[in-house]
């Protein structure tokens, strides 16, 4: 008995393409959720009062201008193109920080992630890495949160996580 194909090739290809598109939308949606959670966490860290001469209490830095918190945000990119995120609302007078954050996130995507689906969470001010290296929590606890949420995301989408 011969095997006979009943489904047209283009119908099968279309079905596979639709399923890939559906999975991609689900991944982007879930990465957005993780990005929003990480940004909300990082921006909500307490800032000690900035009395004259007072030093910050680690792990929290003093947020004098709002630029650093305003530069914290996320983007989701597919094959080097930002598809979601990119909103960096200003806190206090932190308009400069918001612009720096958007610019830095786009640079990171273009430079580091030309292929695949990625979530990039950034603190775009040039001194963010310096504060983090000195022990202040700029994005550190947000990174821990992401490391917890990503495996949950993958499992919910049917991927095996080891």
Where in this protein do the model-derived segments appear?
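N-terminal targeting and processing segments of secreted/endomembrane and organelle-targeted proteins
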Residues: 1-3, 20, 27, 147, ...
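N-terminal, Lys/Arg- and Ser/Thr-rich interaction peptides
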Residues: 1-22
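Acidic-enriched, low-complexity/disordered segments with a strong bias for Aspartate over Glutamate
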Residues: 10, 63, 79, 137-140
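Short, low-complexity, charged/polar segments at coil/turn and helix-coil boundaries
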Residues: 18-127
